């Protein structure tokens, strides 16, 4: 029998592992493994989605015009240069599908989001991992890694899973230094957690080869709705729209996202609450001998003395019903990524790590 084989690169893709949500034998758990907003979505978004559910027998908008207009109004952008997707993951895949293929290279940082590599391989391109400097994007290393085959350069700023970010000046230096026929993709999934940060919008206005992606899954609390968007040069957005399915974002998701992006007061509340407990938890863990880099996101990367200690602490937390994220798959085997939950969750994490450390010292 003739064997049916997939395209080159597909079988090199490891199945994506999302954050765990259950612990065997533990009934009451707190999920802190997927960087979800503990406050949930805006009540306005929930109401809008409930109302939209009454029209689910109709196809959704094919051009997402009302959502694009709301995004443009909120962020001061040109709606014609916005594309919406089923999460920013889909747009990352569009970029690789349209601009990278066999013989092309896609650069990303050593601790970068897993979907960059996955999408590159799915397009038949060669993913190229570039070293970071102390868990921070290294612009010089990225520039040194560029070749004539480089077509896409992905960086998350702020980065996941490290929580670190580089300055706008460094991002501009990177944009200036990559090949002119390559696209710099700025993944701004966590941009809303940084007060006043535009995630590269001004840079895009001045360059022909920079795109930023954003999501409604983090500060907006709509991970279950699957909505993302991107902003870039008109020519690139036009290309991406040619491979986008006509009804790729559902009616309820469009309604919820529009209401969420307009509810700027709620976003500010989420930002401030996150900053408060992020700082508190980081300080508590540091006092226990568990340091973390200054985070610009809704999580902290807690660093332990060894992989064994990190894994033992993770097991201990699970028995307390606290689910965090091991990140050995991101080349960070001695660390745990901990989503910033509400006050109760943060206090529970601090208490559990304290008990773990005390037990380990006995």
Curated annotation (Swiss-Prot):
Tell me the cofactors it needs: pyridoxal 5'-phosphate
Identify this protein by name.
Answer: Histidinol-phosphate aminotransferase
According to its UniProt record, which reaction does this protein catalyse?
L-histidinol phosphate + 2-oxoglutarate = 3-(imidazol-4-yl)-2-oxopropyl phosphate + L-glutamate
Tell me its EC number(s), please: 2.6.1.9
Cross-referenced NCBIfam families, in alphabetical order? Answer: hisC
Q: Which GO terms describe its biological process?
A: L-histidine biosynthetic process
Into which family does the record put it?
Answer: Belongs to the class-II pyridoxal-phosphate-dependent aminotransferase family. Histidinol-phosphate aminotransferase subfamily.
Gene Ontology MF annotations: histidinol-phosphate transaminase activity; pyridoxal phosphate binding
CDD domains xrefs: AAT_like
Identify the enzyme class: transferase
Which keywords does the record carry?
Answer: Amino-acid biosynthesis, Aminotransferase, Histidine biosynthesis, Pyridoxal phosphate, Transferase
Instruction: Specify the species.
Output: Ruegeria sp. (strain TM1040)
Residue numbers of N6-(pyridoxal phosphate)lysine PTMs: 218
Pathway(s) where this gene product acts: Amino-acid biosynthesis; L-histidine biosynthesis; L-histidine from 5-phospho-alpha-D-ribose 1-diphosphate: step 7/9
Electron transport listed as a keyword: no
Disulphide bridges = none
Binding partners and assembly: Homodimer.
């Amino acid at each position: 029998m003739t064997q049916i084989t997939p395209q080159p690169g597909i079988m090199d893709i490891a199945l994506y592992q999302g954050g765990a949500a259950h612990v065997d034998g533990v009934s009451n758990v707190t999920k802190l493994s997927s960087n979800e907003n503990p406050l949930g979505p805006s009540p306005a978004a929930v109401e809008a989605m409930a109302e939209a559910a009454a029209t689910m027998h109709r196809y959704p908008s094919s051009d997402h015009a009302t959502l694009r207009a709301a995004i443009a109004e909120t962020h001061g952008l040109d709606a014609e240069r916005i594309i919406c997707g089923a999460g920013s993951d889909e747009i990352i895949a569009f970029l690789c599908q349209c601009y990278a293929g066999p013989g092309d290279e896609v650069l990303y940082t050593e601790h970068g989001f897993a979907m960059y590599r996955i999408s590159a391989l799915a397009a038949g391109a060669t993913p190229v991992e570039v070293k970071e400097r102390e868990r921070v994007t290294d612009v010089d290393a990225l520039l040194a890694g560029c070749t004539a085959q480089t077509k896409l350069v992905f960086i998350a700023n702020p980065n996941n899973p490290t929580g670190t970010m580089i300055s706008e000046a460094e991002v501009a230096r990177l944009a200036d230094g990559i090949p002119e026929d390559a696209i710099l993709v700025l993944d701004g999934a966590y941009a809303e957690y940084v007060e006043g940060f535009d995630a590269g919008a001004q840079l895009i206005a001045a360059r022909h080869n920079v795109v930023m992606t954003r999501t409604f899954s983090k500060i907006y609390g709509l991970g279950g709705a699957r909505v993302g968007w991107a902003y870039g040069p008109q020519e690139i957005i036009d290309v991406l729209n040619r491979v986008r399915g006509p009804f790729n974002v559902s009616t309820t998701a469009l309604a919820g996202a529009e209401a969420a992006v307009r509810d700027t007061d709620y976003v500010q509340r989420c930002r401030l609450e996150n900053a408060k407990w992020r700082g508190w938890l980081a300080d508590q863990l540091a006092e226990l001998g568990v340091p973390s880099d200054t985070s610009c996101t809704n999580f902290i990367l807690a660093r332990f003395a060894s992989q064994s200690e990190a894994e033992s602490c993770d097991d201990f937390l699970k028995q307390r019903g606290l689910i965090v994220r091991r990140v050995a798959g991101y080349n960070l085997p001695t660390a745990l990524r901990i989503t910033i939950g509400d006050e109760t969750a943060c206090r529970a994490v601090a208490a559990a790590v304290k008990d773990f450390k005390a037990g380990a010292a006995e």
